[in-house]
A protein has these predicted regions:
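Ligand-binding loop in jelly-roll beta-barrel domains
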Residues: 50, 70-97
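Short acidic-glycine-tyrosine-enriched beta hairpin
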Residues: 55-71
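A cytosolic small-molecule/anion-sensing beta-strand core signal
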Residues: 45-46, 62, 80
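Short, conserved beta-strand element in jelly-roll/cupin
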Residues: 35-51
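Catalytic core of non-heme Fe(II) oxygenases with the double-stranded beta-helix
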Residues: 28-35
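A short, N-terminal "cap"/entry segment at the start of jelly-roll beta-barrel domains
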Residues: 1-22, 32, 99-121
Length: 121
């Protein structure tokens, strides 16, 4: 039976996603460089943009999909009003729910190590 998923992303334990949505972005909008503790998929429905993932530039347009692996830095600059679908993959145990930033948030291995240290104290 289908399950209605409330906004707070309360997914059942068997789910292979931890978040998804539709973005409506305007020319000049930018998604700042960031990373996640899970994989992310962007599917472009309409519009154009320039993405950077792990330092590699990609031009995105309708029908394109950009896959970013957990821990990969990525960003987007919108060059034509854009509608896209984003989908977040499985969040590992102790994963963090947000855009994570270099110099502010620990990379995944260091994040796990900090949890282990706290647990041992």
């Amino acid at each position: 039976m289908p399950k209605k998923i409330p906004w707070q992303m309360d997914f059942p334990p068997w789910s292979e996603t931890n978040g998804f949505g539709i973005s409506h972005l305007k020319v000049g909008d930018e998604v700042e460089p960031h990373f996640h503790d899970c994989n992310e998929y962007w599917i472009i429905i309409s519009g154009q943009g320039e993405a950077i993932s792990e330092g590699q530039p990609y031009h995105l347009g309708p029908g394109d999909m950009l896959l970013t692996e957990a821990g990969q830095y990525h960003s987007l600059e919108v060059t034509e009003d854009m509608v896209s679908v984003y989908y977040y993959g499985v969040m590992p145990e102790h994963g963090r729910w947000s855009h994570l930033h270099e110099g502010v948030d620990l990379p995944w291995a260091e994040h796990l190590a900090s949890i282990a240290v706290k647990a041992a104290q």
